């Protein structure tokens, strides 16, 4: 799966979480500024995660404010 991500802080955050998922095989979670939409990086793999992020970026490409990883 290839995800086209626009440049900017949001892109860095998304690329970071996707890279984390690929290298550490962990789950991740992010939330939008309005905190009404929460999404997760599936443990199942990077393809699933990329697909999900693609959907969310279409909804609000500049609204991603933070990415957290479970301890």
From Swiss-Prot:
GO cellular component: chloroplast
GO biological process per UniProt: glycolytic process
Domain of life: Eukaryota
GO molecular function ontology, one term from the record: fructose-bisphosphate aldolase activity
Reaction catalysed by this enzyme: beta-D-fructose 1,6-bisphosphate = D-glyceraldehyde 3-phosphate + dihydroxyacetone phosphate
Compartments, record wording: Plastid, Chloroplast
Assigned keywords, A-Z: Chloroplast, Glycolysis, Lyase, Plastid, Schiff base
Main localisation: plastid
EC number(s) stated in the UniProt entry for this protein: 4.1.2.13
Keyword Plastid: yes
Family named by the database record: Belongs to the class I fructose-bisphosphate aldolase family.
Further remark: On the 2D-gel the determined pI of this protein is: 5.6, its MW is: 25.2 kDa.
Protein name: Putative fructose-bisphosphate aldolase, chloroplastic
């Amino acid at each position: 799966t290839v995800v086209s991500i626009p440049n900017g802080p949001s892109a860095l955050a998304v690329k970071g979480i996707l890279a984390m998922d690929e290298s550490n095989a962990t789950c991740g979670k992010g939330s939008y500024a309005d905190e009404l939409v929460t999404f997760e990086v599936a443990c199942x793999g990077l393809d699933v995660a990329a697909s999900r992020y693609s959907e969310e970026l279409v909804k609000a490409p500049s609204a991603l404010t933070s990415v957290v990883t479970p301890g």
